[in-house]
């Protein structure tokens, strides 16, 4: 059908992250192993902090102008306020763009890190329909103008699905496995 098309300006937008594991455009899944995390994951927050340190000051091009990636060119999102506050504490940068998935609806950033936070299905603080929501996943990933990195524990994919809709929701996360770093 090919009805959905990118705006021509997107071809002129690029980042040069100079990272082996994360290319300069696309979606990337970073598996993170942790235990007993429900609404907060220090492991995921520290990984995001490390990647932010690596990409700050790298080049990006927009409107045919080269610029340096600043902290406000990076967005960090999580499904839970507790992880948002944890990211703010660990990053310790006031100008950092950190919030829940819902907060940034309609906004964009060069690079987006998505911290899914919970360790496994037993540690989900809310129902599967909230956590695995296709719409919320789409909103989170589509905030990225160039690069989206989603961090989650692969144990989340072992969710015990009781309904067809739950299978579909978890399956959307299974599809992210092909973008594994």
What positions do the PLM features span?
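Charged, gly/pro-enriched flexible loop segments at helix/strand junctions
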Residues: 1-9, 156-160
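Conserved helicase/translocase motor-coupling segment
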Residues: 6-89
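Conserved P-loop NTPase motor core of helicases/translocases
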Residues: 10, 100-102, 124
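Switch/connector loops and helix/strand junctions flanking conserved nucleotide-binding motifs
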Residues: 38-39, 85-87, 107-109, 120-125, ...
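Amphipathic coiled-coil/heptad-repeat helices and related helical stalk/stem segments
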Residues: 44, 97, 133-136
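Conserved helicase motor
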Residues: 78-82, 98-105
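A short beta-strand element within the Helicase C-terminal
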Residues: 99, 107-119, 139, 147-151
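Helicase C-terminal subdomain and adjacent C-terminal extension
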Residues: 121-181
């Amino acid at each position: 059908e090919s009805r959905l098309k990118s705006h021509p300006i997107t071809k002129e937008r690029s980042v040069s992250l100079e990272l082996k594991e994360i290319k300069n455009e696309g979606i990337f899944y970073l598996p993170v192993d942790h235990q007993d995390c429900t609404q907060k994951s220090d492991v995921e927050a520290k990984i995001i902090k490390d990647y932010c340190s690596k990409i700050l000051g790298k080049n990006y091009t927009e409107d045919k102008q080269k610029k340096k990636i600043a902290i406000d060119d990076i967005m960090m999102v999580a499904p839970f306020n507790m992880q948002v506050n944890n990211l703010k504490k660990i990053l310790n940068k006031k100008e950092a763009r950190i919030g829940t998935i819902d907060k940034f609806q309609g906004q964009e950033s060069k690079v987006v890190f998505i911290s899914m936070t919970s360790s496994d299905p037993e540690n989900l603080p809310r129902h599967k329909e909230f956590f695995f929501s296709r719409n919320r996943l789409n909103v989170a990933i589509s905030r990225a103008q160039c690069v989206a990195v989603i961090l989650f524990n692969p144990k989340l994919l072992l969710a015990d699905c009781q309904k067809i809709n739950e299978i579909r929701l978890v399956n959307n996360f299974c599809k992210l496995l092909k973008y594994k770093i």
